[in-house]
Amino acid sequence: MHIAVDNLTISVPKIDKPTKAALDYVELLRESFSAKKRQKFSKASLAIRPSDFPDLSNQQLCDILVRVAYNGSHIDEDFRKHVLDLVEDQSLTWNQVLLSVIRTQSDQLYMKSQLCELITEMIRFVQIKSFHDPKHADSLISVILPTFVFLTKLILELLSDEDEMETIQIEYETKFPPYHKPLQALNTLIHDNLCGPLLAMYRSSEEVTRQLVLCSEAFSKLERPDESSVGLLDLILEKHQDNCKPTKYEYTPDGLAAYDLKNPSVRILVPIFACFRCHETSKQMAETVQIFVDIMRVSGDDVVFDLLHAAILLKCEESNNLLHLSKQHRLDFRWQSTTFFYKKLPQIIEHLVSFGKVTAEDVQKGMERALNDLTMLFDVADISWQNASFLTVLNALEPLIGSEAANPLRHRRREYMRKTASLTALADSDEKLIENTDIDRLLNAVKQVMNLQFGQNEEFYQEFIRKVNGDDCEDFDAVMSILISEGRLLEVGKAFAMKSKLAQYPSELSLDERIKKFDETFLLLTRIIVKFPGLSIGLLVNGGPGEISIADSIFYRWSMWYVKRVPRKDKSEEKSEEELEAMRIQAKVLIEEINKEVGIEEEIEEEEEDIEPEVVKEMKESGTEKEKEEEEEDGNKETKNETANDEEMPGDEQKTEEKMDTSETPAEPPIQQQSTPEDPPKVEEPAERINQEKPEEKPKEPLEPTWNEMNCALPRISRKKARRYLGLLKQGNPFWSTDNNSLNIGAILAALPSMGKLLIEEHNEEKHRVDRKSAEEHMANIIHALESMPCLFVCLVQWVDCAPASPARTLLAKTMKNALEKRVSSSSASIADDTNLPKWRFILSTCNEMIHELTDRVPVFPDITCTAFSAARRLCPFVTRDEIPDSTKLKHAWYYMCQQSWTSPHALRLLEHANIHSEYNTWIHLYITKIVGGGCGEIMKDQVDMIFGMLMMDDLNVIIRMHEIMMDFWLSEEAGNLQLDGRFDPLSMTAVIRLMANVMLISEWTLDRLINDGPPLVEFDFTSAMTPEPEDPLRREKWVFLLRQMLDRTVNRLFKILRQGVLCTVVNTIVRLIKAIAGSADCKAKRLLIKRIPPEIVFQLAYIEPQCADYALMNAYCDPKNEEHTRTKIRFLCALRRSHIL
């Protein structure tokens, strides 16, 4: 715009459109006020809104309105209230008003102090612009911090001139000093639930503290101090310091808080580590105990007492018969319990003290408490094991607690034992060991294993192999127990497996020497496998994970085929018919190759020979007098016809009988009527009926080749050759050439399966009468023929053990049992001349459990319903070596475990079998269902902690499956729609949440342990991974991948549910889970899990329901040094003050 004045052109600044619109708005508003028409938003027709001015800038309008409202010494109440109305109407924002206040340029201190009243009003409107973009959180601090600086500088400026303050107060006739309103605004700002934490969470918190201290000092320097203002400023400073302090979240779940002092989980770890995971070192066991102690908040003396309590319970149970489960019918954990009590237990306690969580005073208190409360248990154990068990453990712990603390305890126990008649002889047994007791054998075994520590491997191997020919198997088992407790069993197993392989193949040694070495190593390794059914055969022969280096060893192949164990579930994918046919062809080729390798050159497939076993021949030739009389009555002609039929068609008769056995229809009993020439059709009627029914049966489809057939094929011989070999054995002669140095011992073992089939046929009473006396004589001759290689008898027992169950198999097993027992006892009068007697005793001890299951009746578990009465009977179910427990046995095992203060290893064995067969879902669903239906807080809490301890039964499978099952059941997307679902019962959910949180904590701790323990982890780019087998060389890497995947999926699932924005029972479950994790005891597992769970989850909870989360909960998941976490925390605080829920 240009104005001409006497040939001069003056340029006047042109007003831009936003400014002009703002001035027009103010002018229109002023006119309305002057006309007594103050804007009222309840009447839209009279309202003057900024939105009616399209060119208007809200910030510029706000600046003008604030200046008009606070103009000089006059405060226009209409304009001030209009500003507040615009903020409530959201036509203006709180940050626009605050920026207008702090940017106001004025020399009048009074007017600036009056502006602080507007700051006080605006603090309640502070809110984030949008929750969707975390960067909007930065705009809050960019306004709040300058506002704080504006207030403190104004206070300091006012306090700097006390005379000026007095002048202002007189001039404006105010009751309060000029700093009153700035101080009130500062108080409101610091005490606000959003602004106060904002000023404390950034780096500016130190600057805020410094400014407040300066204000406090300025107040203290006033000549006329204002006590009320000084006190208010002190409260402001104290509040800010509280905001800066890290808050600790405390969570006490309803219903279970009263029972936190009772924790059976530590006691449950003892039988697990003693009997099922005894290969772990004492330090690893102590680390696991420590993490359980941290999670469960168990005191130090309780830990020591619980460990002693469980260990002595284990010793006592191994000495007694259980109801329906006597010692002879169950797996023997005797040496595992002995090794743990006397060797592992003191070491675990020492490691716990070295970790710093358990003190020497705690150990002393725990020992004293055990002496007071467990006296009867120690008495029972001492009498059974012939040793002063408490005194022995006390001696081991004396360097830890000191002699001053140990001597009174030792004196009390020793005096008590001397005054008790049954314990008098054992009072000094801790110092003077009784010979041939378990503790004596254990200490001798420790000394022998020390040779391995000093590198004297061959000396130890020779001493260990001599125990196979020793008089007592207990020494062997003691050494074996020490080896596995020291983590050296795999090393020893690999060494002997290599010796077995070298002895198998021709070498410079003579055949007799090779057979002797092979026999001893085979027996030694077999006993290890039998005594530790959970030990992987591949790990034993290989010395650790990785590709099997001696896969061609006949011991490895035979054991993979014929060591009876719980089968692992087949996880292979379904194959097409072409793939199956290719696999069958490959399996045949593998058999041909292995036959050629061991020196068997003949056709594998051949028709079965129609030659009757010798036992049957002898029976037919000899017969009985009764049969002869019957034959005479029938007539010579009829007898000749029957004999002719027997001679002409033995094969047809045999095939007919086999068809009758395998027919799906029940076989009819043979007709007992005599055949006469007048009625010949009646004799042939059953055979004709069978021949008519048999062709209707569909031929069975060829089965898929097993893993053993494809990966460790065994050589085999023909039936004809097996019959010839068996005939030699029955005559008491070995069937192999004793002077053939080029013989491969694998060819000897290849004959056993075919010979086993022939022996079972000979004992088939359904086809012919078995002469037990002749059968036992033949078996005795077989044992005599195997004197130079007794391990073949063990192989024969193993084959019979794995054969299909039948009466013939049972009868054969009884024959073998009687012959073996006769062999062991027959030489008792001439032991000096029988050099092989100790080895046969070793064999009897090794095969005793197999023979027992084959010959004796399996203990019948009573078929009763699970009622309170039946549970009170304390029935411990029994499982055979390859049995997969059903739900009934698992249920009774659960009742049995719940009634104890720990968990029996015989009950845990059922879980071990279920885990090996991947039947995790069965027992997990069953046991959690029992917990949820309990209804009693104390019982439910103990049961949850008991299941938590059971997670250590398996490597990681149980942890992963338990977590997945609970997530799928309680945190599924479908469950959100079931508001009245019974699974969300409040008390039951408290127990379930406790288990969920503990499972996640132990998972995170295990993951960290896998990553950091051992050599540096090599990262593999797994897209998916199956559960690794023990022999898998990438087992560690796959477990890390699976655990990470499990935890990440859980976090993603929580996000997915919460982002639906619906308040439901599932969200309530997530709230309780997040609170339970945040409120758990401070430990490494919690710190790791907290880092994995992003604070965004807590924000989502507050967004759905602001009342379900507080600031302390958010702080528990936030890292103060992480800016993203700080932004999330600001959004969380903004969500808490939302006026309504979207």
UniProtKB/Swiss-Prot annotation:
Region (Disordered): 600-706
Coiled-coil stretches noted in the UniProt entry, renumbered to this chain: none
Organism: Caenorhabditis briggsae
Function: Participates in the inductive signaling pathway downstream of let-60 Ras and the RAF/MAP kinase cascade to regulate specification and differentiation of many cell types. Positively regulates the fate of vulval precursor cells. Required for induction of the P12 and excretory duct cell fates. In males, it is also required for proper formation of spicules. Does not function in the signaling pathway that promotes exit from pachytene.
Keyword terms: Cytoplasm, Developmental protein, Differentiation, Nucleus
GO CC, any one term: cytoplasm
GO BP annotations, alphabetical order: cell fate specification; defense response to Gram-positive bacterium; vulval development
Keyword Nucleus: yes
Biased composition annotated in UniProt, kind: Basic and acidic residues: 614-627, 652-662, 679-703
Localization annotation: Nucleus; Cytoplasm
Keyword Nucleus: yes
Lineage: Eukaryota, Metazoa, Ecdysozoa, Nematoda, Chromadorea
Protein's name according to its UniProt entry: Protein lin-25
Compositionally biased region (Acidic residues): 600-613
